Amino acid sequence: LRLGDSQTSEGGYDGYRNITIDGGIWDANYESVENKEESGGFVGFRIGHATNVTIKNATFLNNLKSHFLELAGVKDAEITGCAFRGYWKDYEGGGQECIQLDACMPKIFPGYLPYDGSVCENIVIKDNTFEDVFAGIGSHSMVFDRPYKNITICDNQFANLRKRAIWCLNYQDTVITGNVMSNVGGGIYVRSVYTRNSHTLEGQELSAAGNQYAENILIENNQIAIADPALIDNKQWDGYGIWITGEISQGSAGENKPSEDDDPENTASSAANGVPAGRYIVRGVTAKNNMISGYGDGIKLTWAEDCICRGNTIRLSQNQMYSNTGIRVAKGSNIRILYNDMSGGNDYGIYINGTEAAKKICLVYRNTISGFSKDGICALRFAAGGRIERNRVSSNLRNGILIKYTENSIVNGNYTYKNKGKGILLQGCPSADITDNFSSRNGSNGIEINAESDNSRIQGNICGSNSKSGLCITDSKGISVDGNTFDSNKDYAAEFINSRINSNKDNEFNENGHSDNIRTKNSKISEK
């Protein structure tokens, strides 16, 4: 079904109005197509340059290589109560979304003149079912400086999708809530730009790169079960629950670039399609109260700013093809990771890397983390002043909390217990504040700092029943150790090695393995 004439539309959103499609079984019948292996496919429905469109209670079946339903330059549309099933399973070169939101441009949406760059706005996609297809809803192409706006995707059911359920490319003011996704390759993918498929209008004046971002997106109360690892088009597909990412177009040499299934290296040139080189961030995305399970990463954030992960439950299964992490952050700024509960996985619970250049601190607060194959929390080059507070971290196969190469970090009020390595370990972290933590029954030292973690404060902590010492300080100077309690540690209460302790007072020692409690080696302890 095609709406309208290919040449005579008024353009914008004024070409067609007040369209309703109610019911019907629309079978694309790909099995009857000869030479399916050749290039090309077909779209079931195409609607462009329209306002007030309703599609409801329809069933779409058996598509070949493309979209069941494609909207471009459409405002005020609802798609409700529809079912999308069946896709040629032998095709692995792409696997397009069942519902595609697009723009009126010649390379994106040909055959609907004028090509004025009109995008989709005010779209509701609700109470639909997607089964045995490649991908569900979203966009994989965009017009630079023209975001898709006011998109609501809620209460849909997705089952047995080889790729992602939802792709929000250059979306703003969007709500994704109440969806159930089972056995999907990926859950929800949010991305600022996609250089390889970004387009500009002829003569368009472009804003600076930094002005282009996806923002104000709420991802809430979704259930996502990630499928077993798979190969698609002979490439490994790394599954995920939620992936929030910006992009670095070429021209910023040496930066990490996000990868996706059909653009693994983001190899488009910096001037591809007229898009300026630069950093394109994701801003203001909140992922909260989602339930994520299965074999991929729980939540990933890359080149993100002012984003929140709150109250999510993540239950991962270990797989043999790649490592999976509860929450992973790379190159972020002002990221808040709060009140999440996560377990399983053969990598880290929370992994943060490369936020050191950010002017805004990151906060990891009141999360519960257990049963990961590496560290419960690992922060490398954390933003200066970053805070890790009041988390419960247990039964991980390495350390409870590991922080490396970070200044002025605050580690406060955490419970670390039954981890195979240290409870808390800081390496190369000057001016750290390690206060009021409880570290017990870990397989090594309760708290350890080393590698020039100078001028740090260790105060008010309780270290008990650890398999080695309660506290170990190595190769650091200007350290204060005051008001801590060391109880029933197997070796010493505290060890000071090649270090200078400026203050060591008001500490309490009870039944540690060595009666002298403190072991020193090549160290100086102030008598003050």
Residue ranges and their predicted role:
Residues 61-144, 148-150:
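Solenoidal tandem-repeat scaffolds enriched in leucines and small polar residues
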Residues 1-22, 31-52, 68-74, 144, ...:
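Extracellular beta-strand-rich solenoid/capping regions of secreted or surface-exposed proteins
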Residues 477-528:
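Leucine-rich solenoid repeat scaffolds
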Residues 17, 50-53, 71-77, 121, ...:
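Short "repeat-start/strand-capping" segments in structured domains, especially the N-termini
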